[in-house]
Amino acid sequence: EFFPGVEGWFERINAYGASIGVAVEHYIISSGLKEIIEGSSIAKAFAGIFAASFVYDANERPIWPATAVNYTAKTQYLFRINKGILDITNDEDLNDYTPEEKRRVPFPNMIYIGDGLTDVPCMKMVRQKGGSSIALHSGTDTRLTDQMILVNRADYATQADYRPGSELDETVRMQLHYIR
């Protein structure tokens, strides 16, 4: 089950970005299973899906982990997005030096939205490199997200509510104006 408003989020934010001259792309970096994300109703909204996956046998049964994505492994995918090297088997180009002006998605143009502890390293890195990070909480317990603000892991903390007019919606729109 998705957070409220997720299914309409991508199209709406893309349209808003286009209205102010910002091309918006969405990527997901997840410790969850890629196959589950790819089978979801929102999969088509992502320019890239980076998640754990399996190797399958001839009967399409999972037989071995192909890719494991933990909290520290997530950061490499930010560099893949940054450099435009989305093929996870292409480590050579990923590790080659790329001048900042030739990077496809500069870090200051990134908005990282995280909803769990495995997102903390990515939120911190994006923030340190000039982008913005938003820590999400669900329910009324804001202790973790408040702490992320206090220790400079995130710029903003909001309810995991993607509906129009929500605090998250308004925060992302504001960040898109800064990027513009």
Give the location of each predicted region.
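C-terminal cap/substrate-recognition subdomain and adjoining C-terminal extension
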Residues: 3-180
